Every structure is written in structure tokens, then in C-alpha cells.
Amino acid sequence: MSDSPVELPSRLAVLPFRNKVLLPGAIVRIRCTNPSSVKLVEQELWQKEEKGLIGVLPVRDSEATAVGSLLSPGVGSDSGEGGSKVGGSAVESSKQDTKNGKEPIHWHSKGVAARALHLSRGVEKPSGRVTYIVVLEGLCRFSVQELSARGPYHVARVSRLDMTKTELEQAEQDPDLIALSRQFKATAMELISVLEQKQKTVGRTKVLLDTVPVYRLADIFVASFEISFEEQLSMLDSVHLKVRLSKATELVDRHLQSILVAEKITQKVEGQLSKSQKEFLLRQQMRAIKEELGDNDDDEDDVAALERKMQNAGMPANIWKHAQREMRRLRKMQPQQPGYSSSRAYLELLADLPWQKVSEERELDLRVAKESLDQDHYGLTKVKQRIIEYLAVRKLKPDARGPVLCFVGPPGVGKTSLASSIAKALNRKFIRISLGGVKDEADIRGHRRTYIGSMPGRLIDGLKRVSVSNPVMLLDEIDKTGSDVRGDPASALLEVLDPEQNKAFNDHYLNVPFDLSKVIFVATANRMQPIPPPLLDRMEIIELPGYTPEEKLKIAMKHLIPRVLEQHGLSTTNLQIPEAMVKLVIERYTREAGVRNLERNLAALARAAAVKVAEQVKTLRLGKEIQPITTTLLDSRLADGGEVEMEVIPMEHDISNTYENPSPMIVDEAMLEKVLGPPRFDDREAADRVASPGVSVGLVWTSVGGEVQFVEATAMVGKGDLHLTGQLGDVIKESAQLALTWVRARAADLNLSPTSDINLLESRDIHIHFPAGAVPKDGPSAGVTLVTALVSLFSNRKVRADTAMTGEMTLRGLVLPVGGVKDKVLAAHRYGIKRVILPERNLKDLSEVPLPILSDMEILLVKRIEEVLDHAFEGRCPLRSRSKL
């Protein structure tokens, strides 16, 4: 800042300061956005650069301006030269304001000349409005003699109020002024000594007392702290130096006394603070000390932020008490200590868990939910009906503890997507917990914090990720859990799925109870057998059977093909798969209960089409780019006046139209064999494999749905032993022994030996084999199939190739019911088998089989083994005696 008096022109452009005062020597930064202010800055400061000088006048306004701006939204009239004379302590704006309907502006009669220390110009987007950021320094006081409008801003005729250089030199020798100066400096120094421990900028203010001339000192010092607008105006009006120093001393002393009184009150209140409040204040002071030392400031800020986050987490009172104890322990530790990171991670988990946060459920519309289920899942009528019933109960009683639904069925039938549909209908977040291969109880309950690398269980971690306490949680592949020395995860799930216990689920890592009662649990499994009975008892089993070929066809046309095309960047304009070709893919290339293999085959067709489409797209892009590039080169060179050393020859046809609309690729049988290879399955498989005696066709149920199981029997020279192969379980081995015993006992009745005294196994062994030896097999439903194979072997008669069977047998020849009837019938239909022998007591299960399948097959119901044999052989099985044991 310059200490020499400023040469003040007779007229100054005036910038209004609403409810603010700029004092000589003070520096202020403002942002000009109003058109009139922008015009003033541009003409008086930006264009004149260092020579620019403006006047700053305080403006009285009934409404204070916003913190971010010191400018008036409008100053004066845009036309005319109407002037205003000085009247009292303020100058009123010209009468044009009243005529234009604007509220009169009350200008102060005294102002300060100012110069720009820094100017920056900007343009707001997208409006394009020009703005200026100006740093102004106050120079000297002036009084307004006349105020007139010049275009958008005002110009004032001014007269200087500050002393000349000669007057200043004489005033500095005045004893009264010297005494006032000393008194002011003493009061200011006392204020600085009080503030120097609280404000870092006090040191710079202290230097001003020794370096700034006395006639500037009062203005600069008073401008450095907050005072009211009226007090600022009184300082501006204090033209005489003695009056100014007296006024400044009074303001500084008043500010000092207010600080001392506030400190006294603070000290008095601190004596009455509680222990926790004192601890908080001490920690604040400790943080300030560490900031000065540059030690652990970031860590301390992080810990404070973590504590605030914990306070906002909504923990129950007992858990909050536990968290506070952990927080106190963390504060006593240094970040370098071994347990610091684990303690910090634990507290972050407590802060992140959704103790009270829930996702709001919208009003359930069962019609919309049903339409959504029908749109996302084809078929599965009974399953979708059960889900609608579940949602109806939730609608009538939202806080009801519904059952834990467990969808059991082969892969690819939509178990996971059904759980997602429930979450969608309830407007809840969805989280999937995969339990396949989990053998450690700690995966469910978490590891204790004493272990290195410990972490919470999958349930708590999932809740942390979704950040709500009431999601729909899918326990996927719940039948794939195992057990070892580390515990049994299925046992840990007992507490999770029990509504009486999961209100206070105790994760080992969390070590405090967490309420899981708001979570809607849904489980999926391929088989029920591996699930422990206590866990199975806590769930409602909903079986999802495999799809029929007709259902697969509908699913492929409605869901799979659009999804596959989208995943490969194709559309129906690139690739079309007719319905007949999809049917061939189902019949010849897939034999599964679900549709995953079908989707893989469709994806293979899409990839083959994508290769050709990509080649066409490459050619198309080159054709489109030739013309624009050529034109641009010509235009640019001609514009520069240069000569073009090339000749443009018109093309006979437009390259861009050559591949504009390529014809779609339509899948046919030739493409199927080229892409997918020769057919993997055909209807002749059963006939080819049952072409010799000793082979029968059975039906079994596996984790992937129903399957056709061939049984082969042969005899050889031996000692009457029975050999079984095919990776068989104990139950199926017993069924084979039972079947052989029954056949030997009924050998004479079945015309397998002349009399009942002859031993069928004399001097020969029997070997029974179940093909697909790598697949484990067990269960009692192969009993009737084993008997049929043995009778075929001993009688040297072939079993009908179009007949398959299933059923458990007893030693007395009764046929008992079995499970999985629908899946077994569907498997037979997939293989092209038209006749199925079932136990009579399984008649009720046929209602689940789709009518188109039943109408295409012959279902034979039997009570005894003899009936099975009658249906299994051409012309019935000749029995010597029809008596039943």
C-alpha cells in the first residue's frame, strides 16, 4: 500500500456497497455479476488497467445482501443525467427510480476511493454471462457533492476529505495526537495478546502496529475484525484524525471487553462441566496441539469422523455403550500399535451396519406382482401361486413372520430369479449369499476378533453391503454346505432361520446381538436329501420341476433369444432363429430339466452370426468415411488458396449403400450342424440300447431333474455270485439283491426253470451294471427295473424299447410309490419313450404333469411286479401260475 496521498479526480464512477463499508487501507475481494456493476468494472478498471480509480459508497438497504456478494442488484437509472444533491448524511438516488417503480437507494454521503489490485474475468456457462472478480484496496475518503447516472452506473462529483501531506506532518507533532496514538496502540496490543493463542493471523496484525503510519493505523486495525454496519459508518465519518483515533480506541476496547467477558463465562461454565464434556474439550485442545506439531492430524480427524458416523448409526443403547468403550480404547492407541487397525475396522463395521435403516415397502399390488411373475417366468403355475399367497399375507400383515421359502429343483429352472422377483414386488433390496462349498461355521457366524485377519460372517457382511436391515436375503445352494473339524454351517443356520432366535443373532466377530427378524430369507437347493432335518423343518419346501419341451420353446422365444441377441450386440435384423430350429435344438442338442444348455447353444449360434455381422460392419464404416474425408481435404486446401494435386472421380455407385441393409441371417438345419455339430441325441437311443436281452429302461431323479437310467444284466460261468458296478449306494445294492431273490423264488412261475427245485445261479455268476459309472447312484426306485432286466436275461427275451419304469418293490412283489414322478415322466418324454410304468399309488402325482405330455404318452399303473412284467414284454410275460405269494 502507498503512504503518499492519492491524487483524487473531480469525478469518480461509484460502486455501491450494500450494508458494507470499505475503509482506507483495507482490502476486500468482491464478485461482480450485476450488469451495471460489470459495466462499471469493465470501463473504469479493466480498460484503464493501473490508472483505474473508482469510488466505493455504502448503501443503506432494508434487506442485507447475501454473503457471497457485496453488490446491489440495481443502481440507478439507465437513461438521463438527472442528478442528486447532498442532503444531510445521505444522498437519495434520482427520481427516475421512483418513476420506474424501483425502491429509492440511500447512498451515504461519504465514501472511499479505491483501486484494483487484481482483476479476473470469467464467463458463466451456459448463459454466457460475463463476471468479474475484483480485489479492491481503499485509498482515501471523499465526500459526494453531486451524484448522476452515466448509462448503467452512477458517477459522483467528489471532494477530498483526508489531510494533505503537509497537514499530516504537522499533526504528527501534536501532543494530544501522540497520546491518543499511544493509548490506541496499548489497547490494540492488549487485544492482540488475548487473541494470539486463538488466531494464527494475529501475528501479522501485530506487525502493523509498528510499521503502518498512525493516520492509517486506526482504519486498517478496525477493518481487521467484525463490527456492525453502523460502527463502520461512524469510522468512515470520522474525518479528523483525533476523532478517528478516539473512535477506534473505543471500538477496540469494546471488542476486548466482550472477549474477556466471554472467556470469564467460559471458564465458569467449564468448572461445571461433566466428566465427558471436559474430556471432549481436552481432546479438542489435544487435536489443536497435534495440528500445530503436524502429528497425526489426519488420523485424529478420521477418528472424529468415525465417532460422528457411529453417533448417527442409530445403535441400541447397550450396543452404543459397547461401541463407546471400544472408541475410548482406540483413542488411547497409536496408529503404529498392532491392534489399532483391527479395532478401527471393528468400529467401522459397527458404524456401517444398518441398525435402524430400512427400505420402505411400497403398497403391494397383487395384480402387478402376478403380471411381473408371469412376464419374468413362464410356466411354474403352482410356484407362482404360492408366492402370490405369500405376498398377500405380507400385504394384510406387514409385520407377520412369514415362512422361509426354499425352492428345490434342478439347475436352470429359475429358483434365483424367483427370489429376486419377491424382492422386486416388495420394493426391498436383494442380497445373494452363496453357500455352495461352505464347510466352516465361521463363514456364517464370523471369526472371533482374536484371530489375525478375522472378519464378520457372510450374513453380517451382506447386510453391510445393502445398508438396510430388511432386505430379501437369498441363501443359495443351501444343500451344498458341508461339515468338517471347523464346524457345521447348517447348524449355524438353525439360529438364522428360527424367528424366535434370530432377533438376537450373535456374530462371533460382531460380538453383540443383531436383529435379523426383519430380513426375509429365501433358500434354494437342488435336492432335499443333503439338508439336515432340523434345518429342513424350518423351511417350507416348494419344488420346481423341470420344463417340458413346449415350455422350453416358449421360454426360448420370449426370453432367451432376445437376451442372447442383446448380449452379443445383435438384433432381429442381423439374426433370426425360427421356432422350428429352436425346437430342433431342444430335441437334438439338449436333454436337461432347465434351460441353461439351451441358452448356451443359442449363444453359440449368436456368436457365429456376430462374426459375419462384424465383418460387414467393418466394410460399412470404411464406405461411410471415404466421402466426408475427401470433401474435408478439398475444402481445407482450397480455402488456403493452395492447389490440389489430385482428381476426384465420381463413383458409379455409393459405397455406403452397398452394406446399408444386410439381409438377416436365418438359422436352418445346415447352420445348426455347422455351428453345434452333429445331433447329440435322437429318438433311436433307447431302441439301440435295448436291442438285446438283459437290458431294461428305468427312470431316476437326480439333482438336475429326471433322467433315464439303463440297467444291464449278464450271466457268466461262476459260483452263483452277484456283481454290481456303476458307483452304487447301499440302498440300490440292496434293491439288486432283493430283485435277484424275488426272481429266483418265482423262477418256475416265470417259466425260467422247469421246477422250483432248480437253482438259476448254479455254476454261473450274475453281473448287473448301471451305465454312467462316474455318476453316483442310490435309492430304492430301481427295484422294478432290476427285476425286469433279470427276467429278460433269464428268459432271453427283449424288453420293449418304448417302455420305461420306476418303482420300489418288496420281497412279496408289491410295487411301492416313489418320488419325482413329474420329472421322471418328463425325462422319458425327452428321450422319446412313449410308455411309462408307474406305481398305482403315484396316480395323484400325475396331476402335476402337463396335459400335452400326458396325452402324448401311455401311463401304465401297477400294483405288483407281475403287472410290470406283463407291460414290459411284447405279448405279456407268460406265467405258469397266476397265484400271488
Swiss-Prot record:
GO cellular component, one term: mitochondrion
Alphabetized CDD domains for the sequence: RecA-like_Lon
Function of the protein: ATP-dependent serine protease that mediates the selective degradation of misfolded and unassembled polypeptides in the peroxisomal matrix. Necessary for type 2 peroxisome targeting signal (PTS2)-containing protein processing and facilitates peroxisome matrix protein import.
One GO BP: protein import into peroxisome matrix
Primary gene name: LON1
Reactions this protein catalyses: Hydrolysis of proteins in presence of ATP
Name of the featured protein: Lon protease homolog 2, peroxisomal
Recorded family membership: Belongs to the peptidase S16 family.
Major location (coarse): other
UniProt key word Chaperone: no
InterPro entries assigned: AAA+_ATPase (IPR003593), ATPase_AAA_core (IPR003959), Lon_bac/euk-typ (IPR004815), Lon_lid (IPR054594), Lon_proteolytic (IPR008269), Lon_Prtase (IPR027065), Lon_prtase_N (IPR003111), Lon_prtase_N_sf (IPR046336)
Residues annotated as binding ATP: 409-416
SUPFAM superfamilies: P-loop containing nucleoside triphosphate hydrolases, PUA domain-like, Ribosomal protein S5 domain 2-like
Membrane-spanning ranges: none
Bias (Gly residues): 77-86
Motif (Microbody targeting signal): 883-885
EC numbers on record: 3.4.21.53
Active site (UniProt): 781, 824
Start-end of Basic and acidic residues biased regions: 94-104
UniProtKB keywords: ATP-binding, Hydrolase, Nucleotide-binding, Peroxisome, Protease, Serine protease
Annotated segments matching region Disordered: 70-104
Domain of life, per lineage: Eukaryota
Span of domain Lon N-terminal: 12-256
Pfam hit, one: Lon_C
